[in-house]
Structures are given as structure tokens and as C-alpha cells.
């Protein structure tokens, strides 16, 4: 450990060989203990010069000292060279940023919903406030690098009960039983960042701040995909309701045919009951689907940050038109996920923050070196004195000196804390690698859903066409008396089922494409040039608290924030404080 200390001291260009404390006529009741003879002018000049050298040395220690602990390096990411369906002509591997992927559906209502959700969603707003929390935490960490000062003031009255009291101050035979004493000064303490504890703390806070931005982007990507998926689900349900109602009209006609044939003696009452049974079952699907539609609308309102209210601009077009997906989509290559997925970036930054924590914990194994000092004045009314003398040269006092603290006996607590931080880092590194694997799985799932749902829909279109033809022929032959009613019932049910399945498959195609875009990490760019909280929230917080430049006033541009941040976006470990 001593070798480590010497190496760091040599790197900083500093040699500690003793203890230094300077004092200028310090009042013993206010200042630190005094070493030396402050009455000698030459010694006082030497003390001041020594103080200057000490301050310079402290700056060198802070700026050039060692930073104990590992420097973060991301682990290898387990990525495939290509997607499993890379040969499919519907997939393209060119570069694409997916800035506004929802526009591929050419649905102006969906575009409007995305805009509303981005500006009003409360989950996203909550994530934005966490970015501000992390930014303020970074400011706290930066402040630890600098001397901590306090102003101290006080007034004490002394009331001595008797002349026999040992604390009585006397001159000749005269004792002063009551007097006042005043103190005023500045106290400063500066723990030198010799081992990089505070700089590692800045690294931790900076990485956590960038991770909060990446997490915000991940929430935003999830929000946009949820809005699109919910909207597509609503349109799919509307299509299913329209199909059910069309089949109800058709089945009512068949019930009428069965009744007419029964009245004419060409059919039995069984045919009527069977026709009414199928009709009733189909009619029952409408309330069930309406419940599903209402639930989708309720979910959409939450995503839009709205209280329960009619969504007239959406319901006005309740024709069941499901957004159509394009035939081709650009998916890039798996390695692109490492730079494009916000959650992968966040996982990497959390690991980087934890890596710096190892340095913070390891620094506790080494001595903490601080510079302590006071400057102020004191005066008393003793012997005719005046408290105003506190501002006179005769009342001034000054002390400065180093402090040395070393936790040499802690029964393994510090060492085990270092081990704890290291094990936590390893967990975050594994989490990062797992997030890369999970991202690739989600892309593969989305691609499979998108491609195979199109094939499914094509088969179902043929099924619907055949079911329509079968029902038409069965109904005609039943009317002519050449086919029994069971054939008509079967044809009715088959058509309803085929049309319903086609509606679901048609909705699954764009839903699968949305899942692909979500898995590829697109859409976060919508925040470019905007703050992380709404203007109303920013104004509310500014009225409540002085946020300085962290929350610009209305009309001012927000603080610049990196897009999809990574460890390379961290700032310097030594920087100016933020007031």
C-alpha cells in the first residue's frame, strides 16, 4: 500500500515529508491548535508562503493524482452476423435510423396519436424528471471535488458566580464577573482527491446521468410502439365488429328463409331453431368485441395522458380500416443494435457507473488527506474591550494545516465492500450481454411475426373467398330443396370464422412490423431539440426551486443532451461546479 502511495505522489509531483500548520495570532477559543511561534514576522511570512505552496500542491494532487480502480471497458457483445431471415426479399440490410417509422403506415390519425402521446404521456414525463434528478446528482458529485466552506458566528456571555471560581479572569485584585465574547469567521475543509475517490464519484454520477437519458429514450421507444400497437388493435377490433354485424345481417336472412320454408311445410322447426341458434351466437360476439374495443380505447387514453373522455377524432373514422404495412422493411444487421437500442446503451452505462464505484470503495483503503483552515476574528468585553474589535486587525486570527485520516483497522469491512462493488459490476456486465441477446430475440420474433402473418393472411383470403362461395351455393340449394340445412349452418359458421381470422391476421401484420421497429430501437429521435419535461412542468419546478441553467426559462433552448448516449459521452472528471 505504501508503494502505491509513493507512486501516486510521484505522479502528482508531490512529496509529503511532514506536517504543516500555519497560524496568525489565532484566538485559542476559535481556531485550530497552533504549531509554531506566530509572533515572529519572518515565521508568519514563511507560513503564508507555505500555505501558497500547499494550495498549489493540493491542486496538483486533485488534477494529477492517481484514480484508483478499473477503467471501464464494455464486455464483448454476443451478436450474430445476420438475421435468420436475411435471404427474404422483404428484408433489407441497409443503414436506417427509423426516426419516424410510424409514418410508413400512412395513417394521419396514428401520426396525431404519436404527437399527443409524446407531449402528454405521464410515464414519459416521470422518466424525464429522473433525468433531472440524475443531473442534479452529478452536480453534487462535482461539488465534492472542491473545498467546503462554512461561515461561523457566535456570541457567548460569561457569568462567573464567585471570585473563587477557577475560571474567573482577574487583573490584580479586580475580578470581572460578567463579559461577552464574539466570534466570526470562515472555516474551510478540503479533502484532496489524491486517490481519485471524488473523480470516480463524478464518473459514477456522469454515467448514471447518461443512463437516465438512455432509459428515457427506452421509455419513449416503448411508448411509441405501444401507441401504434394499441391503435392497430383498436382498428382490428373494429374490423371484427363490422364482420360480426355483416354476418348477423346475412344470418337473419337465412333465418327468414328457414321460417318461410317451415311455414310452407318444406322444412321442420328444427331448421328454424338451428338458424336462430347460430344467429344468437353471432349477435353475442358484438358485446364481447365491444368490451375489447372499450378496453383498447381506455388503454389508449392512458398512453395519451388523458382522463376518460370521448376520442371523437378517432371514433369518427371507425370503419375498421387496419393500417397497411409496406412490403419491405430495412432491418440492418444485429451489430447495429449496440448503437441504436436505448436499453442496451443504458445497461452499458449502468455497468460503467458501477465500475467507477470500485474505485470509490478502494480509495477507502488509503489515507484521506485534507487541508483545514479558518480565518476570522474574535473579541470580548473583558477588561473594557469592545465586540466591534472583531473587525480590527488585533482581533483577526488565521490557522491552516493538513489533516490525515486512515482507516487501518476495520475488520475487513472496506475490503469486502470493494468485493461487493466488483461482484455488482460483474452482474451488470452479464446484464448488458443478456440485454444484447434479448434485443436480438425481439427482432427475430418481430420479423417472424411480420413475415409469417402475411403468409397467413394470404391463405385466409383464399379461405374467405371459398367460404363465401360455399355459403352462397348451400343457401341456394337449400332454397331449392336439394341440400339440407346442416350444410347451410356449417357454411355460415365457416365464413364467420374465416373472416374473423383474416381480420386478426391482417392486424397482426402491422403489429409485427411495429414490434420490429420497437426491437430495432427506433423513434427516440422525436425528442431531438426538446427538453425532458414539458414546458408546464418546467415552469412549475422553476417557480418552486432555483434550477439555474438545468431548466431554462420558457422560450430558451434546453440544455444539449446526447442522442443515445454511451460511456464516450461522459465529460471530464474535474469540471467547474454548477450553482
Model-derived regions, located:
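Sec/SRP-type N-terminal targeting helices
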Residues: 125-126, 142-143, 178, 192-220, ...
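Periplasmic alpha-helical coiled-coil/stalk elements that build and connect Gram-negative outer-membrane
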Residues: 198, 214-333, 449, 453, ...
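Intrinsic-disorder-associated, low-complexity terminal segments enriched in Asp/Asn/His/Tyr and depleted
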Residues: 3, 24-27, 37, 43
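Bacterial N-terminal signal peptides
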Residues: 53-64
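Short flexible linkers and secondary-structure junctions
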Residues: 67-228, 368-373, 378, 395, ...
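Small/polar, glycine/serine/threonine/aspartate-rich low-complexity segments that form flexible
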Residues: 87-105, 155-187, 310-330, 359, ...
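Bacterial N-terminal signal peptides that target proteins for export
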Residues: 5-9, 41-55
Amino acid at each position: 500500500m505504501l508503494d502505491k502511495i509513493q507512486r501516486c505522489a510521484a505522479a502528482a509531483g508531490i512529496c509529503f515529508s511532514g506536517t504543516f500548520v500555519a497560524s496568525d495570532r489565532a484566538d485559542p477559543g476559535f481556531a485550530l491548535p497552533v504549531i509554531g511561534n506566530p509572533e515572529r514576522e519572518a515565521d508568519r511570512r514563511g507560513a503564508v508562503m507555505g500555505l501558497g505552496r500547499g494550495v498549489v500542491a493540493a491542486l496538483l494532487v486533485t488534477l494529477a493524482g492517481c484514480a484508483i480502480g478499473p477503467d471501464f471497458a464494455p464486455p464483448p457483445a454476443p451478436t450474430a452476423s445476420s438475421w435468420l431471415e436475411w435471404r427474404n426479399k422483404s428484408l433489407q440490410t441497409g443503414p436506417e435510423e427509423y426516426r419516424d417509422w410510424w409514418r410508413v403506415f400512412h395513417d394521419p390519425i396514428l401520426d396525431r396519436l404519436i404527437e399527443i402521446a409524446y407531449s402528454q404521456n405521464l410515464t414519459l414525463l416521470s422518466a424525464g424528471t429522473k433525468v433531472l434528478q440524475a443531473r442534479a446528482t452529478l452536480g453534487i458529485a462535482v461539488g465534492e471535488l472542491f473545498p467546503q466552506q462554512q461561515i461561523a458566528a457566535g456570541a457567548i456571555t460569561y457569568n462567573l458566580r464567585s471570585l473563587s471560581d477557577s475560571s474567573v479572569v482577574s487583573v490584580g485584585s479586580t475580578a470581572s464577573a460578567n463579559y461577552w465574547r464574539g466570534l466570526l469567521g470562515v472555516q474551510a475543509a478540503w479533502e484532496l482527491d489524491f486517490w481519485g475517490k471524488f473523480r470516480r464519484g463524478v464518473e459514477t454520477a456522469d454515467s448514471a446521468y447518461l443512463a437516465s437519458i438512455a432509459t428515457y429514450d427506452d421509455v419513449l421507444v416503448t411508448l411509441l410502439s405501444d401507441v401504434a400497437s394499441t391503435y392497430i388493435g383498436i382498428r382490428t377490433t373494429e374490423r371484427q365488429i363490422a364482420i360480426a354485424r355483416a354476418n348477423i345481417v346475412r344470418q337473419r336472412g337465412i333465418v327468414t328463409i328457414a321460417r318461410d320454408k317451415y311455414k310452407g311445410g318444406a322444412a321442420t322447426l328444427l331448421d328454424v331453431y338451428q338458424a336462430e341458434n347460430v344467429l344468437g351466437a353471432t349477435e353475442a360476439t358484438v358485446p364481447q368485441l365491444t368490451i375489447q374495443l372499450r378496453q383498447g380505447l381506455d388503454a389508449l387514453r392512458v398512453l395519451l395522458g388523458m382522463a376518460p373522455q370521448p376520442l371523437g377524432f378517432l371514433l369518427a373514422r371507425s370503419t375498421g380500416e387496419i393500417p397497411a404495412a409496406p412490403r419491405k422493411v430495412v432491418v440492418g444487421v444485429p451489430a447495429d443494435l449496440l448503437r441504436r437500442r436505448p436499453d442496451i446503451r443504458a445497461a452499458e452505462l449502468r455497468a460503467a457507473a458501477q465500475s467507477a464505484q470500485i474505485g470509490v470503495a478502494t480509495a477507502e483503503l488509503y489515507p484521506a488527506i485534507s487541508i483545514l483552515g479558518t480565518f476570522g476574528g474574535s473579541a470580548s468585553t473583558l477588561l473594557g474591550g469592545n465586540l466591534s474589535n472583531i473587525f480590527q486587525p488585533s482581533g483577526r486570527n488565521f490557522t491552516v494545516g493538513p489533516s490525515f485520516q486512515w482507516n487501518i483497522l476495520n475488520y475487513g469491512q472496506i475490503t469486502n465492500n470493494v468485493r461487493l462493488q466488483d461482484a455488482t459490476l460483474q452482474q451488470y456486465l452479464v446484464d448488458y450481454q443478456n440485454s444484447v441477446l434479448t434485443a436480438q430475440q425481439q427482432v427475430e420474433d418481430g420479423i417472424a411475426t411480420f413475415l409469417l402473418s402475411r403468409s397467413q393472411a394470404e391463405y385466409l383470403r383464399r379461405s374467405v373467398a371459398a367460404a363465401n362461395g360455399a355459403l352462397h351455393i348451400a343457401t341456394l340449394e337449400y332454397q331449392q330443396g336439394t341440400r339440407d340445412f346442416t350444410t347451410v349452418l356449417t357454411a355460415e359458421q365457416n365464413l364467420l370464422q374465416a373472416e374473423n381470422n383474416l381480420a386478426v391476421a391482417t392486424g397482426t401484420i402491422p403489429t409485427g412490423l411495429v414490434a420490429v421497429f420497437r426491437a430495432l430501437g427506433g423513434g427516440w429521435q422525436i425528442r431531438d431539440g426538446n427538453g425532458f419535461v414539458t414546458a408546464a412542468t418546467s415552469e412549475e419546478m422553476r417557480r418552486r426551486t432555483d434550477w439555474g441553467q438545468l431548466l431554462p426559462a420558457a422560450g430558451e433552448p434546453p440544455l444539449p443532451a446526447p442522442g443515445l448516449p454511451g460511456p464516450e459521452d461522459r465529460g471530464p472528471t474535474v469540471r467547474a461546479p454548477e450553482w
